[in-house]
Swiss-Prot record:
It holds the Pfam family Ala_racemase_C. This is Alanine racemase. The modification N6-(pyridoxal phosphate)lysine is found at residue 40. Catalyzes the interconversion of L-alanine and D-alanine. May also act on other amino acids. Its cofactor is pyridoxal 5'-phosphate. The gene is alr. GO terms for cellular component: cytosol. GO terms for biological process: D-alanine biosynthetic process; peptidoglycan biosynthetic process.
Amino acid sequence: MVTGWHRPTWIEIDREAIRANIKNEQHRLPENVALWAVVKANAYGHGIIETAKTAKEAGAKGFCVAILDEALALREAGFRNDFILVLGATRQEDANLAAKNNISLTVFREDWLHNLTLEAPLRIHLKVDSGMGRLGIRSTEEAKQIEARIALDHQLILEGIYTHFATADQLETSYFEQQLDKFTTILTSFESRPTFVHTANSAASLLQPQMDFDAVRFGISMYGLTPSLEIKNSLPFELKPALALYTEMVHVKELAPGDSVSYGATYTATEKEWVATLPIGYADGLIRHYSGYHVLVDGELAPIIGRVCMDQTIIKLPREFQTGSKVTIIGTDHGNTITADDAADYLGTINYEVTCLLSDRIPRKYIN
């Protein structure tokens, strides 16, 4: 992917916001509980390497990623000795690569442990499916089989056991408690407790501090975003959003009544109006569903008109502006703010998706 340093569209990441969110979370954790920064999916769109550096500076004790490639990227970037856990499935043939790079892997099937050829010890975290329904063992019998299998191979180390809550970001807790009971039952079936027992993502840690166990997987809230709007007013501290998205007007013109813009001619001016073309489109993560949404221009709302194109978007201006004028898509301008939550609400999705969609074509600038 070619990063577009030569067009006026960019993301700003506020390192101080990330540091503040981590520090506020750490102040709530017992000293013996580790905070692991979840930097999967290019750090939820914030940039994996620079975010990891910032998180480590703030006191994060390790990292969680989704795939082995992300873990290797961290190792190659200089995180040589840091704890890294791959949360997703890894192919059996890649186990040795992980072992040689001291990367911990998630395991959720006993047969995956068969016929491994390892040149170094492999650290394993056993995933328990307590009700999420994706990956994980579901019974004490499976747990005992895996524990027995690991005991037969001196190269296998059962480093951790964990689960993931499906409803931690909801105020109603009955399903959460059901998952916890199932996880606890499987956990107590082990003859030897692993070093790391971890269940808490951002939502669980913020709302259910008793779930912290030995480590917390701090993800969405590290970036200053609420796990869900439902719990936003119940959070123990104010989150500081780290990401802002900006662009500039590359063309400004006046439409006459009857003039149309963009594909399908879905927008037609009914009177004289000023419009601007922005150098950002759905290839950058500003998907077509943003049509009809709004941005900030000089602190005023300006609607997106017509269809969002692959590389360009058109907005209706409140008045004439100069080419090169700044446009805020996510962020604050003259005291008014558009958040990732606002965009998610318009799109009918969640803030995670809004930032994860932002492609590598957009350069990230790190401030503070």
